[in-house]
Amino acid sequence: MTTLADLRTNYSRASLDAADVNPNPFVQFDVWFKEALSAQLPEPNTMTLATVDEAGRPSARIVLIKGVDERGFVFFTNYESRKGRELAHNPNAALLFYWIELERQVRIEGRIEKTTEEESDRYFASRPLGSRIGAWASEQSAVIESRALLEAREKEISARFGENPPRPPHWGGYRLVPSTIEFWQGRPSRLHDRLLYTRDAASASGWRIARLAP
C-alpha cells in the first residue's frame, strides 16, 4: 500500500518577488496565464470554485474561466445548480487556479455578481450546439433515475429547437469581483513565495501588495 506521508515534491522552478510583479493583479494574472498557455499545460483555464451553503458547509468543483478583465473573473453555469443556489444565498466565493507543472497557484476571493443578459446571451451563442442543448436537457444537481432519461430529454430538446436553441432562463454568467488575489510560487524546503494583492483605494494602482509567510 502506498504510504501517503512519503509522497512529496521539492519545488525549484522559479521565484516570486514584489519587485518583479506588475502592480495590477489582473495584468500579473494575464502574464502567468499566458505562460501557462505557452507551456501547453492541459486546460490551464480550469479553476476550483468554492461556495458555502446556508448551514456554512463548503463545497467545491472545477469550472472553466471564460473571461478576465478589470471587473473580475467570469464563468457560466446553471443558476439552479447547487453552486447557483449557494451563490444566491451567499455571494461570497473563492477561486483557485493550480498550474502544477509551473509550481504555481492563484487564489482569488471576492463577491459574486451575475453578468448582464447580453453577456450571457453572447457566450451561450458561441457554445457548440451539443452544449447548448445540454444546458436545457440537464437539471443540474437534481437526482435523476437513469442516464437513459437524460438522453431522452436531450433528444426531445434537440427536436424542439433544432440548430438554434435559445439560452435557458436558468443558465448564465457570474463574475467574481475580487477583494484579494494571491500569487503562489513553489520554492525549495516548502519556503514558498506568496504575494497577496488587496484592494486599496489610496494606492495608485488601486491595490497594495504584501508578502505572506509560506
From Swiss-Prot:
Keywords: Flavoprotein, FMN, Oxidoreductase, Pyridoxine biosynthesis. Substrate binds at R8, T9, N10, Y11, K66, Y123, R127, S131, R190, L191, H192. InterPro entries: Pyridox_Oxase (IPR000659), Pyridox_Oxase_CS (IPR019740), Pyridox_Oxase_N (IPR011576), Pyridoxamine_oxidase_dimer_C (IPR019576), Split_barrel_FMN-bd (IPR012349). SUPFAM superfamilies: FMN-binding split barrel. FMN binds at residues 61-66, 76-77, 82-83, 105, 140-141, 184, 194. Its EC number is 1.4.3.5. One of its GO terms (biological process) is pyridoxine biosynthetic process. GO terms for molecular function: FMN binding; pyridoxamine phosphate oxidase activity. Pathway: Cofactor metabolism; pyridoxal 5'-phosphate salvage; pyridoxal 5'-phosphate from pyridoxamine 5'-phosphate: step 1/1; Cofactor metabolism; pyridoxal 5'-phosphate salvage; pyridoxal 5'-phosphate from pyridoxine 5'-phosphate: step 1/1. It catalyses: pyridoxamine 5'-phosphate + O2 + H2O = pyridoxal 5'-phosphate + H2O2 + NH4(+); pyridoxine 5'-phosphate + O2 = pyridoxal 5'-phosphate + H2O2. Gene3D superfamilies: Electron Transport, Fmn-binding Protein, Chain A. Binds 1 FMN per subunit. The keyword Oxidoreductase applies. Its cofactor is FMN. Homodimer. Catalyzes the oxidation of either pyridoxine 5'-phosphate (PNP) or pyridoxamine 5'-phosphate (PMP) into pyridoxal 5'-phosphate (PLP). Belongs to the pyridoxamine 5'-phosphate oxidase family. This is Pyridoxine/pyridoxamine 5'-phosphate oxidase. It comes from Burkholderia thailandensis (strain ATCC 700388 / DSM 13276 / CCUG 48851 / CIP 106301 / E264).
